[in-house]
Regions:
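FMN-binding flavodoxin-like domain, especially the glycine-rich phosphate-binding loop
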Residues: 2-4, 14-17, 21-44, 48-145
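Short polar catalytic/cofactor-binding loops
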Residues: 9-13
């Protein structure tokens, strides 16, 4: 069965709410989901997955340090092993939302295939934001099945 890795960092809980909604969307399409905080995700999680979702708060126009650490730990060991696998990403922010650039730069470095535009959510996720996150998960799932 196909599997997706959702890797995220959360400090206030906003990003985690979005990650859970993405997981729900992916799961509704019959795909297994590994949901892990960036500090807990590892190379095996990355290599064993068919697609990816990366989520982060925006910290000074950059991704969270723990997500960058995940990319640092897995980049070279996964080189050439996950090329063209699909990905989506989302950013929770307080008015900037520019961290998406650093996420997309890392996805390009891994040679992943972007499925759709990133989801940017300002402040606490509202009902409609969570629905958009579920839809983001469904789009990723449909790119795999």
């Amino acid at each position: 069965m196909a599997k997706v890795l959702v890797v995220y960092h959360t400090q206030t809980g906003n990003t985690e709410k979005l990650a859970l909604a993405v997981k729900e969307g992916i799961g509704s399409c019959g795909i297994d989901v590994i949901l892990k905080k960036a500090s807990e995700a590892n190379l095996e999680d990355l290599l064993s997955s068919d697609g990816y979702c990366f989520g982060t708060p925006d910290y000074f126009s950059y991704m969270a340090g723990s997500l960058k650490d995940f990319f640092d730990r897995t980049c070279y060991p996964s080189e050439g092993k996950i090329t063209n696998r699909p990905y989506v990403c989302f950013v929770s922010h307080g008015g900037g939302g520019k961290a998406v650039g650093s996420l997309e730069t890392m996805a390009e470095r891994f040679k992943l295939k972007k499925i759709t535009e990133p989801l940017l959510v300002e402040g606490k996720p509202k009902k409609e934001d969570l629905q958009k996150a579920r839809e983001l998960g469904k789009k990723l799932a449909k790119a795999i099945i």
